[in-house]
Design a protein with these regions (language model features):
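Cys-dependent protein tyrosine phosphatase-like superfamily
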Residues: 1-126, 130, 137-197
Length: 197
């Protein structure tokens, strides 16, 4: 006999759940992508989603995915998006291994933020390969727009990047100018989150 379908965590999102069919012959595991987290209502972040994450992503009822890598999106992921009516916004930001490499394309980050700030794209998932550096920079710049203090922006970034935190990413977030985005004041309560994380 299958286990319950509606197991929920304290944050209201599905946890890791086994879904069995009535005969118990086939089970599907519902798992979150690597480094998954809620950024704000309707905005999520993660590492690259795999097929084992599709059931979980389906439960989020995503409208859009913001993909931050230059590599082509895999066919299986494209099919998942198409089958579920999810739009794809790709910003080909190169990954960098060097901790002091400072080649983060500011204009691409700005364009990605415009997509994130547009409530018509919500619910939305922001992701790169591991959900650490490129995703961390986009979310960090969003936090600056929310008027978070820099120490809180850096704390959140470091929670995901851990030992791989990069000085160049933090410097980029510190220097990122949000004034050109202020006219796009987020209508979904993001500016109310000026609290320290």
């Amino acid at each position: 006999m299958g286990r319950p379908l509606n197991r929920r965590r304290a944050d209201g999102l599905p946890g890791i759940v086994d879904i069995g069919c009535v005969a118990g012959e086939m089970e599907e595991e519902v798992a979150r992508p690597l480094n998954f987290a809620v950024v704000e209502t309707g905005v999520f972040r993660s590492g690259f989603p795999e097929a084992g994450n599709f059931s979980f992503l389906r439960s989020l009822r995503l409208r859009s995915v913001v993909y931050l890598c230059p590599e082509p999106y895999p066919e299986a992921n494209l099919e998942f998006l198409e089958d579920n009516g999810i739009g794809l916004f790709q910003f080909g930001i190169e990954g960098h291994k060097e901790p002091f490499d400072n080649n983060i394309p500011e204009e691409m980050i700005r364009e990605a933020l415009k997509v994130v700030l547009d409530v018509r794209n919500h619910p939305l998932l922001i992701h790169c390969n591991r959900g650490k550096h490129r995703t961390g920079c986009v979310v960090g710049c969003l936090r600056k727009l929310q008027k978070w203090c820099l120490s809180s922006v850096f704390d959140e970034y470091q929670r995901f990047a851990a030992a791989k935190a990069r000085v160049s990413d933090q410097r980029f977030m510190e220097l990122f100018d949000v004034t050109s985005l202020k006219h796009l004041s987020p209508p979904f309560g993001l500016l109310k989150s000026s609290a320290v994380a």
